[in-house]
């Protein structure tokens, strides 16, 4: 359901009261999210970012943290970079737009979702 409110010609009243889990909402009031939303809208003709834009933003920082931890150098082979990054990702802990994230031994991202309800055509965070 994330992003449904931004679908062209979608009647947002049809989503009224829908509850969903998503790690990000452009209506979040924290400073980091609002700075991201403003920069995204400025760069994308006022398009509002959804969870997937925020996930993409966060993953770049996670990859940078892993590359730094793995001490990646330009002279390393692709195979060596891949092995070093895979190992380093297990130690990365990121506090990003989509929340606090870490990675499991099998490479899955582990983070807490946030609960939202659609009210008056907007995502409202639930307690």
Enumerate the predicted regions with their spans:
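Extracytosolic ligand-binding ectodomains
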Residues: 1-127
């Amino acid at each position: 359901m994330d992003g449904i409110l931004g679908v062209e010609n979608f009647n947002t009243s049809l989503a009224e009261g829908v509850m969903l889990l998503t790690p990000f909402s452009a209506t979040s009031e924290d400073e980091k999210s609002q700075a991201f939303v403003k920069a995204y809208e400025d760069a994308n003709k006022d398009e509002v970012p959804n969870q997937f834009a925020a996930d993409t933003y966060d993953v770049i920082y996670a990859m940078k943290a892993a590359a730094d931890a793995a001490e990646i150098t330009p002279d390393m082979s692709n195979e060596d970079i891949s092995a070093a990054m895979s190992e380093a990702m297990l130690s990365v802990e990121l506090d990003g737009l989509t929340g606090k994230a870490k990675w499991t031994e099998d490479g899955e991202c582990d983070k807490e979702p946030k609960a939202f309800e659609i009210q008056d055509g907007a995502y409202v965070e639930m307690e």
